[in-house]
Amino acid sequence: MLSYDSVAVLGGGAWGTALAQTGARAGRDVVLWEHDANNAQQLQQKRESLYLPGVTLDSSIKVTRDLSEAARAQAILLVVPAQVLRQVVTSLAPLIADRTPLVACAKGIEHGTHKFMTEIIAEAAPQATPAILSGPSFAADVARGLPTAVTIAATDAGIAQALAQAMNSGTFRPYHSTDVRGVELGGATKNVLAIAAGIVEGRKLGASALAAMTTRGFVELMRFGKAYGARIETMHGLSGLGDLTMCCSTPQSRNFSFGVALGRGESASEASHGKLAEGAFTAPVLLEMARLKNVEMPISTAVAAILAGQISVDAAIESLLTRPLKAEE
């Protein structure tokens, strides 16, 4: 049976550190690669990421700035922002063995190309095996060993199962799937919808409005997923409904917190507070892709318009509430 005993994690931010911890708990030999010199030094000397304070890195994890060292692992987790994934994979490609699984752990769509994460991997490293990890998971929870379930998808069922086994620990439970598109699509779409939910919270519109926004947001996710070939069961699973539910209900979500700040009257630049809210980058791309397939996404459209400065929060809310009445889907 296929197995991966060594795992490299590229990216020493909060999520990368958490996944490195998970790999170590699962009994794998883990190498954590960090590009940033200051954070790499912090990880090596103090065994703590600048982006995840209070979590001590497992002593078995090797920290490196040498990409070729990380490339020797049997499976590689790509825990870098969606918009720099292509750059990282392009640098990694000449260093890896054929069929090495490259697992995207970012939730987004590339600007300009409209490519999903596994499509970028396939283009930049054609000899690799693209895969995706997604689901309702916060770095702080995972790093501390709190119970979490995610989905890992690859087109080859055996590889997906082996990757899930490699990251399986007592508290981190990966389910495996072959619906790569469905898994990555859910993660990217929910980022935009979480901003909308945050706006509702920040505007203090109440629990009823938040429930309505989340539910109708899921309808948009389903429409978009169906148009782009996702399986219905995937949309109803961890990487779809599960991730959406989590990120539309707690300030631990960067996208939700970003939306809360927008709802309180902050500008997009002020609302970011120096942290990456991937949904802000994904929103305009998502809308372009929806138009190509004639998919109606009014909530996502409103978020994109707010971020572009084309409409105020109050005007966006009014436009959603005054849309023509229709039968529920």
From Swiss-Prot:
Superkingdom of this protein's organism: Bacteria
Annotated positions binding NADPH: W15, H35, Y51, K107, A139, R254, L276, E278
Keyword annotations: Cytoplasm, Lipid biosynthesis, Lipid metabolism, NAD, NADP, Nucleotide-binding, Oxidoreductase, Phospholipid biosynthesis, Phospholipid metabolism
Disulfide bonds: none
Positions bound to sn-glycerol 3-phosphate: K107, G135, S137, K190, D243, S253, R254, N255
InterPro entries in UniProt: 6-PGluconate_DH-like_C_sf (IPR008927), 6PGD_dom2 (IPR013328), G3P_DH_NAD-dep (IPR006168), G3P_DH_NAD-dep_C (IPR006109), G3P_DH_NAD-dep_N (IPR011128), NAD(P)-bd_dom_sf (IPR036291)
PROSITE patterns according to UniProt: NAD_G3PDH (PS00957)
Pathway linked to the protein: Membrane lipid metabolism; glycerophospholipid metabolism
Record-linked Gene3D superfamilies: N-(1-d-carboxylethyl)-l-norvaline Dehydrogenase, domain 2 (1.10.1040.10), NAD(P)-binding Rossmann-like Domain (3.40.50.720)
Coiled-coil ranges per UniProt: none
Catalytic activity: sn-glycerol 3-phosphate + NAD(+) = dihydroxyacetone phosphate + NADH + H(+); sn-glycerol 3-phosphate + NADP(+) = dihydroxyacetone phosphate + NADPH + H(+)
GO biological process, one term: glycerol-3-phosphate catabolic process
Keyword hit for Nucleotide-binding: yes
Compartments it resides in: Cytoplasm
Primary localization class, coarse: cytoplasm
Active site (catalytic residues): K190 (proton acceptor)
One Gene Ontology molecular-function label: glycerol-3-phosphate dehydrogenase [NAD(P)+] activity
PANTHER family recorded: GLYCEROL-3-PHOSPHATE DEHYDROGENASE, GLYCEROL-3-PHOSPHATE DEHYDROGENASE [NAD(+)] 2, CHLOROPLASTIC
Function recorded in the entry: Catalyzes the reduction of the glycolytic intermediate dihydroxyacetone phosphate (DHAP) to sn-glycerol 3-phosphate (G3P), the key precursor for phospholipid synthesis.
Full protein name: Glycerol-3-phosphate dehydrogenase [NAD(P)+]
